């Protein structure tokens, strides 16, 4: 399921990062890699705030929809 459907506070394993090659590279540089874990902290406006690799990152809902957990 896309990261946008994950419950707040629930740790999820990243299964796949989709999108264009440059989008995948950008997300991988932020720590979104297959096999890694991600936790949705909150959703504010059009952004999803997540915890990945001990950092909090805000990504747009469009980008979050490309991350499968």
PLM feature spans:
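Compact, glycine-rich, soluble single-domain proteins
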Residues: 1-69
